From Swiss-Prot:
It catalyses: L-lysyl-[protein] + 3 S-adenosyl-L-methionine = N(6),N(6),N(6)-trimethyl-L-lysyl-[protein] + 3 S-adenosyl-L-homocysteine + 3 H(+). This is Ribosomal protein L11 methyltransferase. Signal peptide: none annotated. InterPro entries: Ribosomal_L11_MeTrfase_PrmA, Ribosomal_PrmA_MeTrfase, SAM-dependent_MTases_sf.
Amino acid sequence: MKYFEFTFHTSPCTETVNDVLAAVLGEAGFESFVESEGGLTAYIQQALCDENTIKNAITEFPLPDTEITYTYVEAEDKDWNEEWEKNFFQPIVIDNRCVIHSTFHKDVPQATYDIVINPQMAFGTGHHETTSLIIGELLDNELKDKSLLDMGCGTSILAILARMRGARPCIAIDIDEWCVRNSIENIELNHVDDIAVSQGDASSLVGKGPFDIIIANINRNILLNDMKQYVACMHPGSELYMSGFYVDDIPFIRREAEKNGLTFVHHKEKNRWAAVKFTY
């Protein structure tokens, strides 16, 4: 297959901007992404490339005061998903208890929980601070026989770990069709059951739950907007873990959560990224 290589320059160039840009571009047909100096490099099949769609995605970019420009060239004839996986996705060990790797990795470190994923983008692999923060929470808390919702599941790495630790039943939801397909593949790779994957946003939560545990690793604006729907799926004693934002954003998250009846428990941080825990 023939691909285009797009180079996107973002201002400000932050991890949050690049994360959201990758999600937006994924909906526009892009398959693989590599963070680069000044922005993001992304690959899309030439047959699927619609420049009007790309321009509209940039025009409607959800983060205000962000400038995005791009150039593109015809990429060399190679499998860019495979290229990214082999050159940029390396095994990662979290808290000395959980190792995340792909099927092609050799000499993988041993850990209590061994998760195999075949991602096709640089998010949801465990390398990003927000993912590793939530993984740490899942490792530190009792999950056995607790129902769990993974909202904005991405690769479903969090739901897979939760299921390995005894959570059941588990539901994983993402708005992106690619994430749903990749989640199903990763769940099969890890031979876990009782994880139902579906496509949707917070509006799809109507009639679901209540859940003992909800995890949502998305971004600040979506979390603030969808908090009420999360709380509607909780019962007294339910736990809500959220990440995808910076430490400076915690007051905004906490204010909205407490307005909806949640109690702040704690926060953890890594390289300015934060994860918070609330109970209902």
